[in-house]
């Protein structure tokens, strides 16, 4: 159930170049039961910046009433958020959207989790949920360069983990698909989040597989009212049928929406 709450900053750390790990505490955490959902953050007290920022949920600790999110500080809004200190309050709306269907993976199966850049964080909570139900997980994490690599060790604690960097400064040189080819990775179900180019490449390969992708889109309201994040459906070539990433997604079965 969606709620709005002023949550307390437990801590905030820069864990890679311009990548921040923010831990917040509040009762709203009890509503976070679906990996892949996101929250809408009001980054400043005034009206500038006006719009909330959508940030995915990376980790949930309901015993402590805490959740973790990772984000890249690159625009006015996220740079403002990066200045928040321990003990301060952050206005949070969430959890929002529909997340990854953990129930689609069965115990004993192998799930491949593929993340690109800031699309990596929501896969961490997903991986923990899958491991808890007896699913073997393989992670492929794609980044531009070694300076922005994060959470490699945390993912490795859960299952086999491979890293690809475009410039080859860490892990495999190239893209996530190069890792799949180089290591001959096989799997039963695919979950992925990242840039459109990466998702298109995966869709081209695995349209017949059981697979789910999470889209990264700019959003206005985050609750399905403003129509700023619509995407067209592949089954309707006229382009008149659509879904909203914020409320119908951000997770969709592969092949359902036009990338």
Curated annotation (Swiss-Prot):
Cofactor note: Binds 1 [2Fe-2S] cluster per subunit.
Pathway assigned in UniProt: Pyrimidine metabolism; UMP biosynthesis via de novo pathway; orotate from (S)-dihydroorotate (NAD(+) route): step 1/1
Leader sequence residues: none
CDD domains associated with the record: DHOD_e_trans
GO terms (BP aspect): 'de novo' UMP biosynthetic process
Keyword Transport attributed: yes
Record InterPro entries: Cbr1-like_FAD-bd_dom (IPR008333), Cyt_c3_hydrogenase_gsu (IPR012165), Dihydroorotate_DH_ele_sf (IPR037117), Dihydroorotate_DH_Fe-S-bd (IPR019480), Dihydroorotate_DHASE_ETsu (IPR023455), FAD-bd_FR_type (IPR017927), FNR_nucleotide-bd (IPR039261), OxRdtase_FAD/NAD-bd (IPR001433)
Residues that bind [2Fe-2S] cluster: 221, 226, 229, 246
GO molecular function: 2 iron, 2 sulfur cluster binding; electron transfer activity; flavin adenine dinucleotide binding; metal ion binding; oxidoreductase activity
Organism domain of life: Bacteria
Span of domain FAD-binding FR-type: 2-102
Membrane-crossing segments per the record: none
Cofactor dependence: [2Fe-2S] cluster; FAD
Family membership: Belongs to the PyrK family.
Subunit comment: Heterotetramer of 2 PyrK and 2 PyrD type B subunits.
Annotated function: Responsible for channeling the electrons from the oxidation of dihydroorotate from the FMN redox center in the PyrD type B subunit to the ultimate electron acceptor NAD(+).
Protein name (database record): Dihydroorotate dehydrogenase B (NAD(+)), electron transfer subunit
Lineage: Bacteria, Bacillati, Bacillota, Bacilli, Bacillales
Name of the coding gene: pyrK
């Amino acid at each position: 159930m969606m709620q709005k709450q002023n949550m307390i900053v437990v801590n905030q750390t820069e864990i890679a170049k311009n990548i921040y790990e923010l831990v917040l505490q509040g009762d709203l955490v009890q509503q976070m039961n679906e990996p892949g959902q996101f929250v809408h953050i009001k980054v400043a007290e005034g009206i500038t910046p006006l719009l909330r920022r959508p940030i995915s949920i990376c980790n949930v600790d309901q015993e402590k009433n805490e959740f973790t999110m990772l984000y890249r500080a690159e625009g006015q809004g996220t740079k403002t958020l990066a200045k928040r200190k321990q003990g301060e309050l952050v206005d949070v709306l969430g959890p929002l959207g529909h997340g990854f269907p953990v129930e689609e993976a069965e115990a004993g199966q192998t799930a491949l989790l593929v993340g690109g850049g800031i699309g990596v964080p929501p896969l961490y909570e997903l991986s923990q949920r899958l491991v808890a139900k007896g699913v073997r997980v393989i992670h492929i994490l794609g980044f531009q360069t070694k300076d922005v690599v994060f959470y490699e060790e945390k993912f490795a604690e859960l299952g086999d983990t491979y890293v690809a960097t475009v410039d080859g400064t860490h892990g495999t040189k190239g893209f996530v698909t190069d890792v799949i080819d180089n290591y001959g990775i096989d799997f039963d179900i695919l979950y992925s989040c990242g840039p459109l180019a990466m998702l298109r490449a995966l869709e081209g390969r695995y349209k017949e597989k059981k697979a789910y992708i999470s889209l990264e889109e700019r959003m206005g309201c985050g609750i399905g009212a403003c129509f700023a994040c619509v995407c067209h459906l592949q089954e309707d070539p006229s382009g008149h049928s659509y879904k909203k990433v914020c409320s119908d997604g951000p997770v969709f079965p592969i092949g359902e929406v036009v990338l």
